[in-house]
């Protein structure tokens, strides 16, 4: 609304290209296994071998589904929250983009950092806490998201969203780091890609779609407020996510690869 939609692509894309070039010419490729003091075979496992390996790790199965459910809620919000603000609070697209970008970006980044930091702090003594911290975070975010959607004003909705997004992003750093810890060194990149694929298929593929279907179903009863209650229903999936992270933590100690 303020600058035109095309400018957004330049703002997001150009810095990435510059960073990629800088990274290419300044960062040296590390030696595989050097950090762990291990000798790594030159044989690269196939994608199918990595998938079979992960399927035998109970912690990964629960971790992946827990992360996908967390993303399911997150992508549902990102896709439909602007429409929710317009319908329920009468906000304009320009101010929505300004405030929503700040709320999703800054607290989200802080949440990823502190989620990893807290998990590392507690996980040193008991590895199960690497994922149990995420389980607790997911439980906390369920009522926070509910508060976002049930707020009487847009300002209060944004206030609760700050905490919901911050704590809700605790799962990201820990999920990928622990996936790296349960596979062989030569499998790490593919394992991370598989996790991201699962997250996107369920989170990005189904989250926005389910919100829209629920909103249409509830519209005869709630009218323009149907989107509010559709998003509210979606927030309960955080509890389901917490359950899987709890189970993942129980199995993590047995699945981690030690030096």
Give the positions of each predicted feature.
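Helix-loop-helix hairpin linking two adjacent transmembrane segments in secondary transporters
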Residues: 1-29
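Multi-pass alpha-helical transporter architecture, strongest
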Residues: 20-26, 142-150, 231-259
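Extracytoplasmic gate region of multi-pass secondary transporters
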Residues: 55-115, 167-176, 203-212
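Loop-to-transmembrane helix entry/capping segments in MFS-fold secondary transporters
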Residues: 93-97, 185-195
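Helix-to-loop junctions at the C-terminal end of transmembrane segments
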Residues: 111-127, 215-216
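Paired intracellular helix-loop junctions of major facilitator superfamily
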Residues: 123-125, 179-188
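C-terminal transmembrane helical hairpin of 12-TM major facilitator-type secondary transporters
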Residues: 125-175
């Amino acid at each position: 609304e303020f600058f035109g939609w095309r400018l957004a692509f330049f703002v997001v894309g150009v810095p990435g290209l510059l960073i990629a070039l800088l990274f290419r010419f300044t960062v040296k490729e590390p030696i595989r296994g050097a950090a762990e003091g291990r000798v790594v075979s030159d044989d690269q496992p196939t994608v199918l071998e990595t998938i079979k390996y992960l399927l035998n790790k109970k912690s990964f199965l629960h971790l992946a589904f827990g992360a996908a459910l967390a993303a399911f809620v997150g992508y549902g919000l990102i896709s439909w929250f602007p429409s929710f603000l317009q319908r329920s609070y009468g906000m304009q697209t320009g101010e929505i983009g300004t405030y929503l970008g700040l709320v999703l970006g800054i607290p989200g980044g802080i949440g990823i950092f502190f989620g990893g930091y807290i998990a590392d702090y507690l996980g040193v003594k008991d590895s199960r806490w690497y994922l149990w911290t995420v389980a607790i975070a997911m439980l906390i975010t369920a009522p926070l998201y509910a508060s976002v959607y049930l707020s009487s004003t847009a300002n209060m909705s944004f206030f609760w969203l700050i905490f919901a997004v911050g704590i809700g992003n605790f799962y990201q750093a820990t999920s990928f780091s622990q996936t790296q810890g349960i596979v062989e060194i030569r499998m790490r990149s593919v394992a991370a890609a598989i996790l991201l694929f699962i997250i996107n298929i369920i989170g990005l593929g189904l989250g926005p779609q389910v919100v829209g279907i629920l909103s249409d179903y509830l519209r005869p009863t709630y009218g323009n407020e149907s989107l509010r209650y559709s998003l509210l229903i979606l927030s309960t999936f955080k509890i389901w996510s917490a359950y899987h992270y709890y189970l993942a933590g129980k199995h993590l100690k047995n699945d981690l690869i030690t030096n």
